Each structure stands twice: as C-alpha cells, then as structure tokens.
C-alpha cells in the first residue's frame, strides 16, 4: 500500500479507528459486569442484558447498514455511526439504573452495527481492487488488538477508577474520529434498489421478541402469559418473513441462498455453534471474579491467553482445513471446545490457577479454528450474485446467536442459583459448576449438524479471502 495517496492512507486509518473502537467495546465490558452490578444495586445474574442489548441491536440493524451507506453516502453514515456510538458511551457512563444502561447500550449498538460494514464498504470504494486484501488486512488489525486489550484494560479501569471509565474513554476517541471523518473521508454514493422495509421490520421484531422471551421471567420479570405472547409474536413475524421472501426478488435475504447445501449447513452450524461459544467471553470473567474471587484486573489478564490463541491459529487454519476437510475439522473442534470448557471448569474448581492460562490459550486456538471454518464453509459455494446477501445474513446470524448465547448463560445462572449469588456465598461454586456443565453440553450439540457436511468438502482455494470477508 506504499503507493497509495496520503489522503487514502488517512481514510484507511479512520476506518481502522472505527474497527478498534467497536472491537474494544465488545470485550472491555465483560470484565466490568460484577462491579456494574454492585454499583447499580443489581444481582450479577441480571447483568447479561448489558451485553445482550448491544449485540442484539447490532444484529437487528446490520441488514440496513449497507443500504443506508449506498443511499446516503459512506462518509455521512460512518460519521453518524461514530456519533451514535460516542453518545451511547456517554449515556452509559451517566446511567444510574440498569434500564438506563440497557437503553444506552442499545444506542451504542446502532452505531456499532453501521461502523464495521460501512468501513468495509469504504475500503472497497477508495482502494484499487488489486490492493483490497492488503488494505483490509491493515484496517482489521486494530480490530484484532481491541479484544486483546479490552479485558485487561476494563479490569484495570474498574479496579483503579470505576466502571464508568470503560465508556468515558470512548468519548475523546469518538470526537477525534468524527472530526477526521468529516474532514478526510469522501462521501461515495451509488444507485440503490428499494429497501425491503417490510422484511426488515419482520426480521427485527422476530429476533428481538424471541430473545426477550428466552430471557423469560428470570431476567425480564415477565409473566408466563406475556412470555407466551412474545413467543407467538416472534414466530408469526418470522413465518411472515418467509412468506414475504418467497419468490420476492427484492427481499432482504433471498431464500435462494438455502439452495446451496453448504450454506444451509454452515449457517445452521454457525447459529448453533455461536450460541455455545458466545457464552464463554461473558461467563469466564464473571466466574473468575464471583466464583473464584479474582480481582477485575486479574480476571482481565486471564482473558489475554484466549485472544492470543485465537490470533495464532488464524495463520494455519487454511492448511488444517485443506488437510482434514471441513467435516472432520468442525466436528473435532466442536467436541474439543466442549472438552476444553470442562477442563477449564475442573482446573478452576480444583484451584490449579497456574494451569488456567494454558487452558484458555487452548480454548482460543480451538474456537478460532472452528469460527474460521464455519465462516468459510457457509460462503464458499455461493454464486457471485448471492455472495453479498449471504455474507450479510451470516453476519446477522453471528450477532443474533451470540446474544442468545449470553441470554441462555444468564438464564442458566438464574436457574441454578439464587438472585443473591456473591463471592461470600457457599453455594456459588456449585452454581457455576452446574452452569458450566450445561454450557459444555450446549457447545457439543452442533457436532450433529457438522457431521452432515459432505466428507469431500475440503477444496478451499479461496478460503483466506472468504474468511476475511466473513469476520
């Protein structure tokens, strides 16, 4: 990229800045949840909604982000995304109740949903095709650093300042990013087809109400009748979308995608697989602090080996898949992740704390291999005219399944424990043990889906390109 104009390089830095903000926020909050609960006067069992409100909003808003960027312009939407994300961060820091915090996190999610896909679109507009891969590698690198710094930085801020600072640090960064976007980024637009508003609303309602219904009386305090009503509304909304999308060329996501068997299997496996693995980044720091008595900073440091293991495997996952094939790799990594989850629980409860970093490093390696394999399996055989739509649907499913995973983790904690789980409670470790055993079972279940992948699905010439497109 050395031959790119200075203006283009600055524009790439702005996009990288946005990627860093969004990725940092996905991990920095996890370590602070027990402290937030204490400050807001809430049970730690309710705090999973702080993550769910953000991730679910991202899932709901993702389908609209690309269309808005094409219609209104990439600069205008990227600027709006940064402003909304920054305002959401300010309101999070000012929140005095859990409900206020959840609303502020949802506002953050609207900005986060637009930031990454619009950033990818911006790179496509400003960089020549032959340099697109190098440019995307450059702008996504800060996005890989964010999860590495997030847990430790979150723990450090909570321990030596307060949880409010995990949001306040976004404000100066956001202001600089917004000003730089207005000054340096071109406002590319293009012809767009009519937005499928009906399909968007049906999907949004279906995803949101079913997730709320899943949280149930333990998290939302709803009556059984209200929960049944939410389930009915969600199911009806999704069925109506299927009827709406059938033979509709303007549908948000074409049902033709599911004619490709590897896409159908990959999407189903990604949805089920990320429900299980989505529990881990939430549950691990909560368990370390509430179950084992770690300080926030110590718990944050313990998350770093997991991220390092994940980053290290990305270099060799192509060779692994090409050598053994998708079915073997996905079944093995799914069952392996379940076993590593049990190993983490066992070593932690036995007090072998010096072993935990190695177990978490192994967990990161296995999880990264599975993620990359799921992403590329899902997209690799799609025809070119459906690749963009398939990638958008996969991105939405990734966020939705993560929000469901965190919701189920909170539900399991509420099922096995009281509303007053604390470090001083004698039953706390038992509650976490049952929760961890249930998680290991949920993580293993997608192996049945991956076992249906054709055994000869291993030719993977374009895996590295497709893999990055799905991250």
UniProtKB/Swiss-Prot annotation:
Cytoplasmic face residues: 33-48, 98-101, 159-164, 218-224, 284-285, 363-395, 452-471
A Pfam family matched in the record: MFS_1
Periplasmic side of membrane: 1-11, 70-76, 125-137, 186-196, 246-262, 307-341, 417-430
Superkingdom per UniProt: Bacteria
Compartments in which it is found: Cell inner membrane
Record-annotated membrane-spanning stretches: 12-32, 49-69, 77-97, 102-124, 138-158, 165-185, 197-217, 225-245, 263-283, 286-306, 342-362, 396-416, 431-451
GO cellular component labels: plasma membrane
CDD domains named among the record's database cross-references: MFS_LmrB_MDR_like
GO MF: transmembrane transporter activity
Topology of the protein relative to the lipid bilayer: Multi-pass membrane protein
Main location: membrane
Gene3D superfamilies: MFS general substrate transporter like domains (1.20.1250.20), Multidrug resistance protein D (1.20.1720.10)
Family: Belongs to the major facilitator superfamily. TCR/Tet family.
Stated name of the protein: Putative multidrug resistance protein MdtD
Gene source species: Escherichia coli (strain 55989 / EAEC)
Lineage: Bacteria, Pseudomonadati, Pseudomonadota, Gammaproteobacteria, Enterobacterales
């Amino acid at each position: 990229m050395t031959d790119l104009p200075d203006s283009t390089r600055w524009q790439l830095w702005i996009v990288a800045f946005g990627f860093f903000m969004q990725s940092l926020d996905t991990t920095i909050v996890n370590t602070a949840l027990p402290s937030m609960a204490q400050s807001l006067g809430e049970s730690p069992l309710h705090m999973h909604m702080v993550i769910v409100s953000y991730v679910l909003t991202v899932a709901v808003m993702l389908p609209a982000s690309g269309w808005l960027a094409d219609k209104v312009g990439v600069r205008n939407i990227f600027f709006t995304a940064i402003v909304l994300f920054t305002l959401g961060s300010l309101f999070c820091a000012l929140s005095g109740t859990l409900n206020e915090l959840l609303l502020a996190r949802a506002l953050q999610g609207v900005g986060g949903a637009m930031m990454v896909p619009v950033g990818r679109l911006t790179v496509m507009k400003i960089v020549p095709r032959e340099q697109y891969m190098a440019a995307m590698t450059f702008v996504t690198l800060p996005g890989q650093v964010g999860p590495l710094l997030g847990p430790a930085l979150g723990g450090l801020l909570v321990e030596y300042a307060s949880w409010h600072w995990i949001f306040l640090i976004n404000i100066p960064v956001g202001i600089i990013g917004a000003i730089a976007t207005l000054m340096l980024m071109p406002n590319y637009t293009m012809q767009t087809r009519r937005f499928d508003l009906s399909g968007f609303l049906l999907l949004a309602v279906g995803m949101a109400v079913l997730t709320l219904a899943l949280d149930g009386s333990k998290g939302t305090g709803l009556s059984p009748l209200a929960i049944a009503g939410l389930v009915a509304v969600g199911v009806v909304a999704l069925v109506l979308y299927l009827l709406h999308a059938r033979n509709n060329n303007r549908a948000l996501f074409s049902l033709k995608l599911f004619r490709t068997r590897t896409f159908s299997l990959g999407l189903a496996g990604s949805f089920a697989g990320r429900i299980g693995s989505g529990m881990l980044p939430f549950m691990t720091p909560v368990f370390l602090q509430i179950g084992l008595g770690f300080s926030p900073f110590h718990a944050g440091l313990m998350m770093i080996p997991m991220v390092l293991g994940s980053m290290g495997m990305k270099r060799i996952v192509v060779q692994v898949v090409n050598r053994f094939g998708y079915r073997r790799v996905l079944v093995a990594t799914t069952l392996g992740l379940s076993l590593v989850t049990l190993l983490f629980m066992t070593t932690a409860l036995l007090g072998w704390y010096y072993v935990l970093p190695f177990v978490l490093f192994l967990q990161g390696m296995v999880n990264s291999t599975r993620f990359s394999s799921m992403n590329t399996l899902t997209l690799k055989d799609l025809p070119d005219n459906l690749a963009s739509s398939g990638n958008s649907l996969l991105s939405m499913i990734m966020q939705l399944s993560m929000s469901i995973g965190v919701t189920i983790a909170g539900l399991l904690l509420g099922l096995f424990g009281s509303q007053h789980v604390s470090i001083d409670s004698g039953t706390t470790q038992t509650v976490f043990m049952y929760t961890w055993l249930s998680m290991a079972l949920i993580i293993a279940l997608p192996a049945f889906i991956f076992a249906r992948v054709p055994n000869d699905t291993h030719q993977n010439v374009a895996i590295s390109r497709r893999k990055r497109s799905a991250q």
